[in-house]
A protein has these predicted regions:
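Asp-based phosphoryl-transfer active-site loop
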Residues: 3-18, 224
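Active-site metal-binding loops of divalent metal-dependent hydrolases
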Residues: 9, 45, 215-217
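Conserved acidic, metal-coordinating active-site core of Asp-based
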Residues: 94, 101-214, 218-226, 235
Length: 250
């Protein structure tokens, strides 16, 4: 019996980078919650973005944000998985030196840091995704222990640009996953959306077989592989469809 449903957002429920969602989803989710199902929004988005997107039912949901690095209720943070400072600062320096066509940002549980308030990534995150943004002169000069995600950005081919140098340099020191054509997300090693879901499974004394997940991209693979029932949407990457062998595709 399914007791918890977790879904990705961008590419799964709506078009990437939108704050417009079909209102019918709200009705369906609300009915599921009324039947006792725990419903979890599980995305690479920031909490403020997820909270705005699901406004009509926002107080009834649980939230996994920033690619699995933050677990929270509408009112409080339950768990975070911060990155080692040397890792995210090293990533930042490498993007500057080796990937001049790319931009980047660093996320805390509540807002993101970027170095140019006029840059495309700053405006995209703030205006299209509804993120809380902070402009700083130099991310590597930040003295913080709450950076939970570092993300590389390119508008068309981020994964392609990161593959020759960046990904090989860091994929044994951190968890890296493409999240659409624009993003490569970097979490602490071993931390994915499934890590956060596992925390909730333990918290509510559930079994993986009592969990149902929906997703479309590489950062969804772990949760799709481990949930009792998983669904890849029709536009999912082929790697994602292949990963959830023997399960339904919608």
């Amino acid at each position: 019996m399914i007791k918890l449903i977790a879904t990705d957002i961008d590419g799964t429920l709506l078009k990437d980078g939108s704050l417009l969602i079909d209102p019918e989803y709200m009705s369906v989710i609300d009915r599921l919650i009324d039947k006792g199902i725990i419903f979890v929004v599980c995305s690479g988005r920031q909490f403020s973005s997820e909270f705005k997107l699901f406004a009509p039912i926002k107080h009834k949901l649980l939230y996994i944000t920033d690619g699995g690095t933050v677990v929270r209720t509408p009112k409080e943070i339950l768990k975070t998985y911060p990155m080692d400072e040397d890792i995210w600062k090293g990533m930042c320096r490498m993007v500057r030196d080796e990937l001049p066509a790319c931009d980047y940002f660093a996320a805390t549980p509540d807002f993101c840091f970027a170095e140019d308030g006029g840059s495309p990534v700053f405006h995209l995150l703030r205006d299209s995704y509804g993120f809380e943004m902070r402009e700083v002169d130099d991310i590597t000069r930040l003295d913080r222990n709450d950076i939970i995600k570092f993300t590389v950005f390119h508008p068309d081919k981020c994964e392609e640009l990161c593959t020759p140098v960046f990904i090989p340099a860091w994929n044994k020191k951190a968890h890296l996953a493409a999240a659409g054509k624009e993003w490569v997300d970097c979490n602490a090693k071993g931390v994915s959306k499934w890590t956060a879901l596992s925390y909730l499974i333990d918290r509510f004394d559930l079994l993986p077989d009592e969990v149902c997940c929906f997703g479309d991209n590489l950062n969804d693979i772990e949760m799709l592989q481990n949930a009792g029932i998983s669904y890849a949407v029709s536009n999912a990457r082929q790697e994602v469809i292949a990963a959830e062998i023997g399960r339904a595709h919608v």
